[in-house]
Amino acid sequence: MDEKGTSGELVTEGFEYDGGRQVTVYLPPVRSQAVVFAGDGQLISHWGADLEAADLPPTMIVGVHRSADETLRLHEYSPGFDPQRFAAHEEFFANDVRRWAQSRFGVVMPPERTAVCGVSASGELALAVGLRHPCVYGAVLCASPGGGYRPPDVMPSSLPRAYLVAGTQERFFLGNAKRWAVALRDAGGEVVMTARVGSHGDAFWREEFPLMVAWAFGGKAGRAPSERITGPERGCP
C-alpha cells in the first residue's frame, strides 16, 4: 500500500538545523494514541497507510529526514564517529523536534506510548537515543542496525524495551541485531529478537514496521515475533 491509500495526513515542515532539515509527520485519521519518532524520516513517515491497514492503535509518526550526505548521515546516527556531530543531532531529534511536535499537534505521550525507530544506520540512532532517553522513549524499534555503534561495556540502569529485527539474507546486519539483543538481555532489558527471510532494503523494513508498532503499543498486525528474550523490569529513576 502506498501513501495514496491512507486516510491520514502528511505534514512536512522545515527547520534551521544544519542549514535546513525537514521533518515529515504522519497524522492518523483519528486522534493519536501513540507516537513513533523516526530517523530516516523521509522514508518511514510514509508508512502510515500500513498502520491503518493493520488492527493497531492510531499512531503518529514523526519522521526526521536524513542528511543528503551519506557520511554526515552516519556521523549523526552513530555516536562513535563524530561525537560532536552526533550530540548536535541528538539535541535536535530528541529535544527540539519532540517539543515542536507536542506544541504543533497537541499530543504528549508517556514513555509507554512513545517509541524511537530506525532502519540500518538510523537503527543505530534509535538504539543510541533510546538508551540515553529511556524516560522519553519507552520502546526502541530497530531494523537491520549497522555496526558502527556497538553495545557499551556498561549499560544504563534504566532501559527501554527493544524490538530488533533483521533479514536472513543480510548476515552482517543480522549479526549486529543479535549482538544488541544479547547485550540488552544480559543488562536486564526486555527484548524481542526476530530474524525473517529478507534482505537489506525498504520493502523488508516496511513489512516489519506494523509488527513493530503492534508489539510496542498493542493490536494485531500479522505474524508473531519469532523469539522473545526478557529480563527483570527496569524503571526510570
Predicted regions mapped to residue ranges:
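Non-catalytic cap/lid and distal C-terminal segments of serine-dependent acyl enzymes
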Residues: M1-P237
